[in-house]
Amino acid sequence: MTRVRRGYIARRRRTKIRLFTSTFRGAHSRLTRTTTQQKMRALVSSHRDRCRQKRDFRRLWITRINAVTRENRVSYSYSRLMHDLYKRQLLLNRKILAQIAISNRNCIYMISNEIIK
């Protein structure tokens, strides 16, 4: 069989992977086989955690709103507050409500008074 000259294709692929894993520690940034495995693992983790991040922030916002409503007797619970908001068609999302609850609690009182009327 004749010798096949492959050029720089494999080397280019390996250097691309090494650039991705250059900040990893130990053999994970040096050895080709482990770098490919760690690259795949890193990409899987980043995809999973992008989806998880949305869940975590939503939970945080709900916890903050619930804490303020229970602490200052704005409403009996978070779920009742949200139900009354939708009933009165005051469409505020949870992120904005959580920011209002932390920074300006008087505004939460005003919103709850609007709901009660």
UniProtKB/Swiss-Prot annotation:
Q: Which Pfam families match?
A: Ribosomal_L20
Stored CDD domains: Ribosomal_L20
Ordered alphabetically, the record's keywords are:
Chloroplast, Plastid, Ribonucleoprotein, Ribosomal protein, RNA-binding, rRNA-binding
Here the disulfide bonds are none
What is a biological process (GO) this protein takes part in?
Answer: translation
Listed GO MF terms: rRNA binding; structural constituent of ribosome
| InterPro entries hit by this protein | Ribosomal_bL20 (IPR005813), RIBOSOMAL_L20_CS (IPR049946), Ribosomal_protein_bL20_C (IPR035566)
Per the record, its GO cellular-component terms are: chloroplast; ribonucleoprotein complex; ribosome
Task: Spell out the family assignment given in the record's similarity comment.
Answer: Belongs to the bacterial ribosomal protein bL20 family.
Q: What does this protein do?
A: Binds directly to 23S ribosomal RNA and is necessary for the in vitro assembly process of the 50S ribosomal subunit. It is not involved in the protein synthesizing functions of that subunit.
Q: What is this protein called?
A: Large ribosomal subunit protein bL20c
Q: Which organism is it from?
A: Drimys granadensis
This protein's gene is called rpl20
